[in-house]
A protein has these predicted regions:
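Conserved, well-structured interaction surfaces
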Residues: 40-59, 80-153, 171-184, 188-203, ...
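Acidic, glycine-rich segments characteristic of secretory precursors and extracytoplasmic regions
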Residues: 20-71, 101, 116, 134, ...
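Long, intrinsically disordered, low-complexity segments
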Residues: 20, 52, 107-108, 185, ...
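C-terminal substrate/ligand-recognition segments
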Residues: 401-523
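Short coil/turn linking the two alpha-helices of tandem helical-hairpin repeats
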Residues: 150-157, 201, 221-227, 511
Length: 648
């Protein structure tokens, strides 16, 4: 009777779960028989192609918004819109995440596809070499699925077989006991993928070296949560193999990797590609929620000296994701006298032409600059909102700068010239190279500026920080940035640049400062065009490394957010001297924006405060996000383990 009841319970659980389309499916969705699919390499390969799409989009690795939304949860980015109550990101403030939030607890349909690849390829009559490759791809895709669950929630149901109604025991598979067990599954699958994948692969499919980038990434995350030194060794071995044996160098065209000019650059080891026949601007938040919406009437009302001249409204999107001044400050500037790479406000060209003013002297709206638009509405620096809803314990205004009377250059030129080369490829800034062929001005009254539309503080589908993202946007759209325009688009998922970053971090964790600095200097000098770091202490090296990763990997998947979780787990120099596992300082503070005067001779940098934006918070429970409570409740109903993560 006990066996009978357990079987009924397992079947009932299966039936309850398959009522949801994306769960424990036990029947193939294809009309082809298993024999037809798996005894022909071409049909098996087609199934794997479909599984790549399912896994990469289903986990969010190549999902719309995966770059910009997770970046908005770090000091690099901001999500903000005053249109229709869209507001700000709820994870950055922790006001919008509860145990009902789903971060991917139920990935059974994805795992079923991966397990079918592994099982059916093993049992097929294909050549051994074909079997090995297909199995390796199945392990790779399953490893990615497990990894996404591990780094977000820490624990998951590790299904490694193709379930059927008769699998009563497998249907009761428990959650992994802890993060340590979870990462064993992740690392085991990715390691198997590395051993079985070919050295090269077509665009959109994983090679051995793509798998090694993911493996090194996963090993760093695993080490942060388990402190097992073996993961550092594997991270180093994997990253070095990519660097030394792939035969692929860092590209000289960093920006081209992320737009239409060089989408299959050799440095890209794995990308996700969509063609315009079935893709439109609206399908990608990196486009539709980044490009602004600005009308010719807005520009004329704001007295812009550069407006649309062709009659075509180039920017007709719904921008709500923007880079911050915190991000921009990471990009160093080459000193014109010494050649050293320095923060913009420490260079000789800055000191010769500008001076800092006490920020405490800024006390009222419009004090720095102000003008009236044609309709009589005012635009001010600072705005009234800039002085309200600030986060205590942090300066309201971080920097107030003005040109010296003798200055022959304006502040836009001083701040943005001779920057790290990745800056111009990543950020749209005042007077930058034309965007969609249109000259951009972001100073007070500028054509795409904060106050160019109805709201003085921006967020009316236009910038709220003084910047826009350029990385991952397209440079040419016909006829404009509009929701239904067809586009070729791609996401970069793994590349050689990350291998250098992962190597540098692992070497730092082992105390090998010189090796870490050598690794980070590759991207810093080749992609950034900067003088190399000369850091010689652990503290200096961590500072330069974190800066380098933020620049190199900005707005690239979820990299920076999960890097911050690692750095918080490490503590010490990786998190401002705090103890391991303490609050992540940079995720617990406000972010800053820039406001540039009309004549570009004054700049004010202050907190982004509108709609509670300054109220960013990080509590330690966020090191592991919640396992969706509804998922756990279903498990509890059938007598299965259902423990929630601490604090949720």
């Amino acid at each position: 009777m006990k066996i009978h009841l357990e079987y009924i319970s397992a079947c009932a659980l299966l039936l309850s779960m398959i009522s949801c389309k994306d769960t424990l499916d036990t029947n193939p969705s294809s009309s082809f028989t298993e024999e037809v699919v798996w005894n022909s390499y071409s049909t098996a390969d087609a199934f794997i192609n479909g599984t790549y799409v399912a896994v990469l989009t289903g986990t969010g690795l190549a999902g719309s918004g995966n770059c910009v939304s997770w970046e908005a949860r770090t000091p690099n980015g901001l999500q903000f819109s005053q249109v229709g109550g869209e507001g700000i990101d709820g994870i950055a403030t922790e006001l919008g995440v509860t145990n009902a939030t789903d971060f991917g607890a139920n990935r059974f349909s994805l795992l079923r596809r991966c397990n079918k690849i592994i099982t059916n390829a093993t049992n097929s009559n294909l050549k051994d070499s074909e079997k090995a490759k297909l199995i390796a791809e199945g392990r790779f895709l399953r490893g990615l699925t497990f990894f996404d669950q591990a780094r977000k929630m820490g624990r998951f149901v590790p299904l490694t077989t193709v379930l059927s109604i008769s699998d009563s025991a497998a249907c009761r598979t428990p959650l992994t006991a802890n993060v340590d067990e979870s990462y064993k599954y992740v690392i085991d699958d990715l390691s198997a993928a590395v051993n079985g994948l070919p050295a090269s692969a077509p665009s959109g499919r994983a090679s051995k070296y793509a798998a090694e980038v993911f493996l090194s990434r996963a090993c760093l995350q695993a080490y942060a949560y388990t402190k097992k030194a073996e993961y550092l060794d594997k991270a180093i071995t994997s990253a070095k193999d990519v660097i030394q044996n792939s035969g692929i160098s860092l590209t000289s065209n960093y920006g081209g990797m992320f737009n239409e000019s060089d989408p299959t650059n050799p440095e890209i080891l794995l990308g996700y590609y969509r063609v315009k026949e079935n893709s439109r601007v609206e399908n990608f938040a990196e486009l539709i929620r980044v490009y602004p919406n600005v009308r010719l009437d807005d520009m004329k009302n704001s007295k812009c000296y550069q407006t649309y001249t062709t009659g075509v409204m180039l920017f007709q999107a719904w921008g709500m994701y923007f880079p911050t001044q915190d991000m921009v400050d990471q990009y160093l500037v080459t000193d014109e006298n010494t050649g050293k790479a320095l923060p913009w406000y420490e260079t000789s060209q800055f000191k010769d032409n500008a001076e800092e003013v006490d920020v405490n002297t800024v006390t009222h709206a419009g004090q720095v600059d102000m003008y009236a638009r044609k309709d009589g509405s005012r635009r001010r620096i600072p705005t009234p909102q800039d002085l309200k809803e600030t986060k205590t314990g942090y300066p309201i205004f971080q920097r107030y700068v003005r040109c010296k009377p003798s200055a022959t250059r304006n502040l836009t030129d001083i701040m943005y010239s001779k920057r790290d080369k990745r800056f111009a490829a990543t950020i749209v800034y005042d007077s930058c190279a034309a965007w969609l062929g249109f000259p951009v001005t972001l100073n007070l009254g500028g054509n795409l500026s904060q106050g160019v539309r109805e709201m003085e503080d921006g967020g009316w589908y236009n910038t709220a920080t003084g910047y826009y993202w350029r990385k991952n946007t397209l440079e040419k759209l016909e006829p404009r940035a509009f929701y239904n325009v067809k586009v070729d688009f791609h996401y970069v998922l793994a590349r050689v640049g990350e291998a250098y970053m992962n190597l540098a971090e692992a070497e730092l964790l082992k105390g090998n400062v010189s090796a870490a600095v050598e690794a980070l200097n590759h991207t810093r000098t080749i992609h950034g065009g900067l003088a190399p770091s000369t850091a010689s202490t652990e503290e200096q090296a961590w500072k330069d490394y974190i800066r380098e990763r933020r620049c190199e990997m900005a707005c690239e998947g979820e990299d920076i957010y999960f890097s911050y979780l690692r750095w918080g787990k490490y503590g010490g120099y990786a998190n401002y001297g705090r103890t391991p596992g303490d609050v992540v300082y940079d995720l617990d503070r406000p972010v800053y924006k820039i406001e540039i005067s009309r004549d570009r001779r004054k700049v004010l940098i202050g907190q982004v405060t509108v709609a509670g934006s300054a109220n960013r918070n990080f509590t330690q429970k966020r090191y592991l996000l919640p396992i969706q409570q509804g998922f756990l409740n279903t498990r509890e109903a059938y007598g299965l383990d259902h423990e929630q993560n601490q604090g949720w």
